[in-house]
Regions:
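Structured beta-strand-rich core segments of catalytic domains in phosphoester-bond hydrolases
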Residues: 2, 29, 53-137
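Acidic/histidine-rich helix-loop elements
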Residues: 15-32, 149
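Conserved beta strand-loop-helix elements of the APE1-like EEP
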Residues: 91-110, 232, 236-243, 267-288, ...
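Surface polyanion/phosphate-binding segment centered on an Asp-His-Pro turn
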Residues: 176, 295, 299, 304-342
């Protein structure tokens, strides 16, 4: 189990929403924790972004991330600068859901590189740390997007882009997240030359309206006043237009759902399957992307309402620049004789 490694020089990076981990200490809660630990170990990944570490305060949240790291055979402590006190790579979310990063032995966090963004920036949080996994150092991030407010989600995705892509020409970055939205990345159609949606499927198409669709869909009304709805891709488009590229789209991976399988998923019980968990990279890493996969097993289906996703990549110095896929740029202005044509 786990994404097979195809290169001795590669790094495996995974993202996993662990479904209210540590929410309670009941027998069911302890069994849930056991399943999550077993799932993480089975991933056999190098770096892991996690979402939904539950805790009422910072001290207990950081302790719980350390517990998960210890039980999964990973690490999560970033040393301070100049030998200062270290800290767990966890970003507190203002609503009790926290995001963090784990990594295997042999990967070294850059002292003082941890950054956590929560209240005032995001509905949940963003955790970032620079890791040395061989080759150029890369900034890794874990994020959990807001489940409510489509415009808020788009606005906070702008904040995320700013945090991971500035300053211009800075470190390459890779982020694993529960995006809570549909992908809007485009890929070049080799026959027509047009840039088309990688993921044209609308998971809400053909379904009758229900109240929770206000969090995911745009809508209007026909001449008879009947409501028409469609997936709101604007939050996803902010990410792609801002220079954070969905690895699945870049690699043209076959579409595979990450949510909709679990009995606690209010969309899934209506037959809706979605790919809302994913990994995005800045342009510096595009040429090093090797493979992508969703860990869809009986174990991961039982453990969480989200399936873990993994990407294999080689650091920028080991990836030939010519391997980087093309990305669209702004189209040139039409010639004078073409202006005004439909």
């Amino acid at each position: 189990m786990g994404l097979p490694r195809t290169s001795a020089d590669s790094v495996l990076f995974s993202s996993y929403n662990v479904l209210n981990l540590f929410q309670d200490d009941t027998p069911a809660g302890r069994e849930h924790y056991r399943l999550i630990v077993e799932s993480v170990r089975a991933l056999d990944t190098d770096v892991l972004a996690v979402q939904e570490i539950r805790a009422p305060d910072g001290k207990s949240a950081r302790a719980r991330l350390r517990q998960l790291a210890d039980d999964a055979g990973m690490r999560c402590t970033v040393p301070g600068r100049a030998g200062g006190a270290g800290r767990s790579a966890l970003a507190m979310g203002p609503h009790g859901y926290h995001a963090g990063l784990l990594w295997r032995d042999g990967i070294e966090p850059v002292p003082g590189s941890f950054r956590g963004y929560g209240k005032g920036d995001f509905w949940h949080s963003l955790a970032c740390v620079t890791l040395d996994a061989g080759g150029p150092r890369v900034r890794y991030a874990a994020h959990h997007a807001t489940p409510f407010g489509r415009q808020l989600r788009a606005d906070q995705n702008e904040r995320l882009v700013a945090a991971l892509t500035n300053p211009r020409g800075g470190r390459p970055a890779i982020v694993g997240a529960d995006w809570n939205t549909e992908c809007a990345d485009r890929v070049r159609d080799e026959d027509s030359g047009e840039w088309v949606l990688y993921e044209p499927r609308d998971p809400f198409a053909g379904l009758g309206w229900f109240d929770e669709l206000i969090y995911q869909c745009e809508w209007d009304y026909d001449k008879r006043g009947r409501r028409r709805h469609r997936a709101d891709r604007r939050p996803g488009d902010v990410l792609w237009a801002g220079g954070l590229h969905d690895v699945a789209a870049v690699l043209r991976a076959p579409w595979q759902a990450t949510a909709g399988h679990h009995p606690d998923d209010s969309y899934g019980v209506r037959g809706i399957s979605r790919r809302i968990d994913g990994i995005r990279v800045t342009r510096q890493l595009l040429g090093g992307l090797l493979s992508y996969g969703v860990e869809d097993t009986e174990l991961t289906r039982r453990a969480s309402d989200h399936l873990p996703v993994t990407v294999e990549y080689v650091p920028p110095a080991a990836a030939p620049a010519s391997a980087a896929p093309s990305v669209p740029t702004t189209a040139p202005a039409p010639a004078a004789g073409e202006r005004g044509r439909a």
